[in-house]
Amino acid sequence: MYIGELASLTGATPKAIRHYEKLGLLPVAKRKGNYRIYEEIDVQSVKMIRLAQAVGFSLSELYDLSALKYKNNRFPVEVAQQLIQKKNQQIIEQKKALNRLQEDLKQLEDEIIQTYITHKIPA
């Protein structure tokens, strides 16, 4: 399949796909003349790259996994699982921080009501 079809199947732009290749996240596509030719495995790879980005992984983090894959001739599942666990822990911490922020906003609102409405202090 050509890059346009890969793009439409994955939601990635052709420019993004070429960027993934340049970074080494995708193997360099075979060529037919001036056209890149992709395979079904590339569809899955691009979908995983996009999902990983959507959940907060940077392209450099993905590159590190990709480098290990090519170095060891197999995808580093254990390393990926560790990174996912770490990202999940970061999300848990972010949720806690957002909950604290929400509590602070409620406290601020309560203090404004207490000060300016209950005690009728001019604003």
Descriptions of predicted regions:
Residues 2-5, 27, 40-123:
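Arg/Lys-rich, alpha-helical DNA-contact motif
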Residues 6, 13-16:
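Short glycine/proline-centered loop/turn elements that form peptide/ligand docking sites
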Residues 7, 21:
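The alpha-helix within a helix-turn-helix
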Residues 17-18, 49:
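Short, hydrophobic-biased segments on the C-terminal half of alpha helices
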Residues 20, 33-34, 65:
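Residue-level "edge-of-site" marker
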Residues 26-33:
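Beta-hairpin "wing" of winged helix-turn-helix
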Residues 34-40:
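Minor-groove-contacting beta-hairpin "wing" of winged helix-turn-helix DNA-binding domains
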